[in-house]
């Protein structure tokens, strides 16, 4: 099978993690070829790694340099970038949440459904953890009965105020 040329738009915290995972060969058949970010001062670091760089997601999408796009931008950009990528025939993986509003999520999903030959996914990494798999098994197996409401409080995922101050969109 051929390798998939991947581009990443958004080089903040999670975007950098995706870059490193791809450059370290942790994604079978995935080859990072290009990145985009709205802050041009970030781009020389990636050019030095041999990647093509773009100053906007739209430019990356139109470049012809990639087969698939990973979207790691602020939430409010997920819908427009995802739809634009799908419309030109790119596979799309978008960070959570897939959109900032329900109506936008529905538009993005509809765009993906209109292109069944493409792969579209949202990054919800917790779904593969054993504890969440067990809960899914219990719910789907009916062992908990008919659920009307679930209140779930996670107390092991603390973020200091500095995290929220690190970007004006958080």
Language model segments and positions:
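Conserved SAM-binding strand-loop segment of SAM-dependent methyltransferases
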Residues: 51-57
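Predominantly a Rossmann-like dinucleotide-binding segment in NAD(P)-dependent oxidoreductases
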Residues: 126-170
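Short amphipathic alpha-helix with an adjacent loop that forms part of the alpha/beta core around
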Residues: 57-64
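Receiver (REC) domain switch-region micro-motif
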Residues: 35, 69, 150
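Nucleotide donor/acceptor-binding cores
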Residues: 2-4, 118, 148
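N-terminal Rossmann-like dinucleotide-binding module
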Residues: 1-49
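Beta-strand-loop-alpha-helix segment that lines the small-molecule cofactor/substrate pocket
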Residues: 68, 74-75, 79-127, 142
């Amino acid at each position: 099978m051929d390798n998939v040329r991947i581009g990443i738009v958004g080089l903040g915290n999670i975007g950098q993690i995706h870059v490193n995972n791809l450059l370290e060969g942790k994604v079978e058949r995935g080859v990072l070829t290009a990145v985009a970010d709205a802050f041009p001062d970030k781009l020389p670091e990636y050019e030095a790694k041999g990647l093509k760089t773009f100053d906007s997601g739209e430019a990356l999408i139109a470049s012809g340099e990639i087969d698939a796009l990973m979207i790691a931008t602020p939430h409010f950009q997920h819908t427009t970038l995802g739809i634009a990528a799908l419309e030109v025939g790119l596979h799309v993986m978008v960070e959570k949440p897939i959109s900032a509003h329900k109506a936008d999520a529905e538009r993005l999903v509809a765009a993906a459904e209109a292109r069944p030959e493409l792969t579209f996914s949202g990054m919800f990494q917790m779904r593969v953890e054993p504890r969440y798999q067990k809960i899914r098994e219990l719910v789907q197996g009916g062992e908990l009965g008919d659920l009307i409401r679930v209140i779930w409080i996670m107390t092991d995922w603390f973020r200091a105020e500095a995290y929220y101050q690190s970007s004006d969109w958080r």
